[in-house]
Every structure is written in C-alpha cells, then in structure tokens.
C-alpha cells in the first residue's frame, strides 16, 4: 500500500538513471566524480546488477509511469562493461512489461569500447548513444586517460566513426574544465565539424575533502571551507566560454546545432520548463539506482546522506515521491540566498545545480552558486538575442531568423 505521506505520483513522470556496472570504468578520468563511488560498496567485489534486480526494476519502473512513454537511461561508470547479452535481457524485460507503453533507451558511454557489434545492436533497437568527449585530442587527453595514464581520444574517435557507419543517433557530453575552457571556439567547432548536432556542456566544479571510507569529493553536507579540485573551471572562464561560443552559434548554427544550455535559456525566456533539472525551479525529478538497488536523490548526490533507500525494501514511488526527496526538490528554490532572490536573471538560471552552491552572497548568506559570476555574464550577454528569438517564437516564426538579422547588420 502506498505511503500516505508521499506526493501524488501523477504530478510528473518518474525518472531513474541506472548504473548496471556501478562505478566500474575502463578509464580513470582525473576529474571523474563517480569513479570513487566504489568506496561506498567496499564489501562487494562484484558491482554488477543481477538479472533479478534488473527484472524487478524494469517491472516496477514501467508500472509506476503515468505517461505513455518510458525512458531507460543507462549510465556509469562505463555501462558498456556489461555485455550485449545483458542489454538484450533488458530489452526482453521491457517488452514483457511494456503493457502498451513506448519504451526508449539512451546510454552514456566514453566510447572506447564501441564495436561493430555494439553499434549494430544500438541501430537495430533505436538507442540514442551519448558520447563523453572533451573536444580536440589535446584537451580530451589532458584528463580523460586510462588507469595506466594512457590517452583515450583516438579510441573515442574510432567509436564515433562506428556510430556514424551504422547510422546510430548520437550526441556529445563535454566536460568544461580549467584547461579546455581557455579554447572555446576550437572546442565548439570540433563538435560542429564532426557532425554532432546535440551538445551538452558540463562545467567541472568539485571540492576536495577526506572521508573515512577513502572518498575525496565533498557533498553539500561537508565543511564549506574546503579547496576546489584543480580541474574546476573558474566563474570567469565559464562566463567567457559560454559567451564566446554563443556569439558564434547565434550567427551560424541556430536550428542546426543544438546546445543544451542555449535551448534551456530560451525555454526559461519563454516561461516553459527547460527540461534540464539544473535550470529548473525545482529538481529531484531524476533519481539514480546503483547496481544493488540503492536509490539516491541525484547522480551528483550519490552520498550516504542522500540515499533514499533500496528497491528491495521500498518501492520506487515511495522513495522518489517520499518526503525526503520532495524536500530535496523544494530546497533548490527555497534555499536560494537573498542575492539570488533579488537577481533579474534568477528566472533563467534558478540558481543552477545545488551541488555548486557553496559560496556566500554579497549579504553574507550561504548558498550562492560558485559559478554565479559566469552565469550572470552569460545571461546578461544573451538577453537581447533571447528577447528577439522569443518574439519570433510567439509570432510562430523560426528563431533561426536571428541569423539573417545579424548578417544584415
């Protein structure tokens, strides 16, 4: 029986990111926030999701959905460390429990393990593949290396070639760090020139501490006066990076290359949901399930203090719509400091991701986003362009018209 203290499950779709191989990965990227999550499961040497766990999750996840479409997201670690047979079982279970719903799958991979066989599987089953790649070789190989310290870029590019060969739909997730942030146009043009139509930028902001179990990355529950990891992008770098790329994109690529943060900005300008939790008023809509059934509030909050429970003991609905997760969701908005509440750009960023809110604002209140200066620079810079594109959309004209206006001015 459903707990009476949970929010209505019909308010929004249930969304859970799966970790079928836990934090296991064939790379050892120097900035990775997830690799050390293995320390949370030191009593288990086999961080692989069992067939039993896979079936329980699949059945419950589909049954909990109130929408006609269901999205399965496979993440890591490196999810391709599981065999194709595992994912064939996953597809069979999805078909078994679909009950008339449309099932879609997306997988995020570093791309180094892709083969013809994998790509044939993705093509035949219409999977979307996200590739983690940090731009040109020099910038990618600076941080994204093997456990032996060897570069990985060439293997990733081979993987992308195989995806193209088999006509698999793919997009890119690129980490912006202290090194590659200094080269925004070269970075952006690399993706555009390689035929990547959908691009997500993820700024690295991590703080270092020491936990008894060996973990070194901090959560918001840790002491706030702790140092940043060396790879972390600075607010100034982040603002300059976004503005420089936007100026190129808005003149050449609107409607052709889709950059997630630009799409989210326009959505918030229009007053519609941006679809990405970081730029939404509230978050907590996307949980994470580890290999053993442990469920956490968010992929960036896989810490003991943000564990919601285990699927063997509690239902997904009880965990993800329960009071602990609802409080986590509301806190994104209710914990904004005074400076944010007074800001004319709050509607566009909503404070961004809570994991980055560890600074004090100009009034001395805790909770300002570390990247605030960069975001404000970006939103102020793009405001007139967003105003124009908003007017075009409201008039039922394509926002890409802005390119013609800029060309003629």
Per-segment meaning from a language model:
Residues 30-34, 134, 213-220:
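Short, flexible, mixed-charge acidic loops at enzyme active sites
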Residues 291:
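A cytosolic small-molecule/anion-sensing beta-strand core signal
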């Amino acid at each position: 029986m459903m707990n009476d203290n949970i929010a209505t499950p019909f308010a929004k779709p249930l969304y859970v990111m799966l970790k079928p191989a836990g934090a296991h990965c064939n790379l050892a990227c120097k900035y990775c926030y997830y690799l050390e999550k293995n320390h949370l499961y030191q009593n288990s040497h086999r961080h692989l999701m069992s067939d039993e766990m896979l079936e329980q999750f699949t059945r419950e996840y589909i049954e909990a959905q109130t929408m006609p479409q269901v999205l399965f997201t496979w993440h890591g670690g490196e999810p391709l460390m599981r065999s194709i047979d595992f994912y064939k079982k996953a597809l069979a279970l999805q078909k078994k429990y679909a009950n008339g719903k449309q099932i879609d799958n997306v997988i995020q991979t570093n791309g180094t393990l892709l083969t013809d066989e994998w790509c044939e599987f993705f093509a035949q089953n219409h999977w979307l593949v996200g590739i983690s790649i940090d731009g040109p070789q020099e910038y990618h190989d600076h941080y994204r290396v093997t456990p032996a310290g060897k570069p990985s870029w060439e293997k990733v590019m081979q993987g992308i070639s195989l995806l193209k060969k088999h006509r698999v739909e793919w997009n890119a997730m690129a980490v912006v760090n202290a090194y590659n942030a200094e080269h925004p146009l070269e970075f952006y043009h690399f993706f555009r020139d390689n035929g990547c139509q959908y691009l997500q930028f993820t700024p690295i902001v991590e703080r270092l501490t020491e936990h008894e179990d060996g973990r070194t990355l901090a959560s918001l529950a840790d002491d706030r006066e702790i140092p940043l990891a060396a790879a972390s992008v600075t607010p100034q770098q982040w603002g300059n990076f976004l503005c420089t790329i936007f100026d190129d994109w808005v003149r050449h690529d609107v409607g052709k290359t889709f950059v997630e943060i630009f799409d989210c900005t326009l959505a918030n300008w229009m007053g519609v949901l941006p679809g990405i939790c970081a730029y939404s008023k509230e978050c907590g809509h996307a949980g994470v399930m580890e290999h053993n059934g442990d469920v956490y509030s968010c992929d960036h909050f896989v810490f003991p203090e943000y564990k919601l429970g285990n699927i063997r003991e509690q239902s997904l609905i009880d965990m993800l719509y329960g009071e602990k997760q609802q409080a986590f969701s509301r806190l994104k908005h209710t914990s904004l400091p005074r400076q944010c509440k007074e800001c004319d750009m709050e509607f566009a960023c909503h404070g961004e991701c809570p994991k980055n809110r560890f600074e004090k604002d100009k009034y001395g209140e805790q909770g300002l986003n570390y990247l605030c200066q960069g975001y404000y620079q970006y939103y102020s810079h793009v405001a007139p362009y967003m105003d124009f594109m908003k007017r075009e959309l409201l008039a039922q004209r394509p926002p890409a018209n802005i390119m013609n206006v800029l060309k003629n001015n």
